[in-house]
Amino acid sequence: MDRYVTDIKNGCYQNPVLPMDFSDPDAIRVGEDYYLISSSFTYLPGVPVLHSKDLVHWERIGNCVERLPFDRYAQPAHGCGTWAPALRYHAGRFYAFIPLPDEGIFYTEATDPAGPWSALHCVKSASGWIDPCPLWDDDGSVYMAHAFAKSRCGIKHKIQLSRLDPETLEVVEDGPIVFDGTLSQPTAEGPKMYKRNGWYYIFIPAGGVEYGWQTVLRARNVYGPYEEKIVMHQGASSINGPHQGAWVTAPDGSDWFLHFQDRFELGRVVHLQPMCSVSYTHLRAH
């Protein structure tokens, strides 16, 4: 399998930790192991799975998707296929929630992240639903945050929260719009949802792929109202559009954020940033 190393051998690492195209990354830790997946559009096998022991040294171990269950993908389809996925671990199983912007939201599951992964199962048949992320709550409820693709459905800047059937993981209720970023967070998309210490967090990129920023929403109730705060932006650095990714906590309790940077012809490379808490109100990536 492919291995990617950006350790500079003095106790430090250099960004990007994945200096090649792994767009729209999501990652989790299970025990001592980290796993990362990314979008792959119409390339197959798709939605690559990477493994790491330290968030710096990565190895590609498999793919979540062997084929797309639609005849149209027998031919190239620019801008279609698998968009920003989410990776979660629940009750001994790995779940990858994967959007196809023209067909809907799907999931695949596995007991071993290297595979085999199940055939895609439809969560919601819909055009324009993208960037899904599930959350299994403490009371057994299951939710899914997602964004919209204006190119498909005419809706933009909004995050919706739907309720899923705990057994089938299919949408049973199209929930409310829990955040509208039209004025303050244009192009709000790519939600990643977490629950920590009684708070619901939704991490959203905003501002667009090339020059956007990272925003965090939080609320005490899953349906809000959500506070918002920009936690990372380019500033005076050379890292354009640092946003969209995963909040991961290491075994030692330290928090880290994996996100992409659009390097144009080189693709979307992945950076690793340490995180800290600021006045116990929000999280910030350095």
Predicted region positions:
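Conserved Ser/Thr-centered positions that define the repeating blades of beta-propeller domains
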Residues: 52, 108-111, 164, 219-220
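Hydrophobic core segments of beta-strands in well-ordered, beta-rich domains
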Residues: 28-43, 83-101, 106-107, 120, ...
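Structural motif
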Residues: 45-48, 104-106, 154-160, 211-217, ...
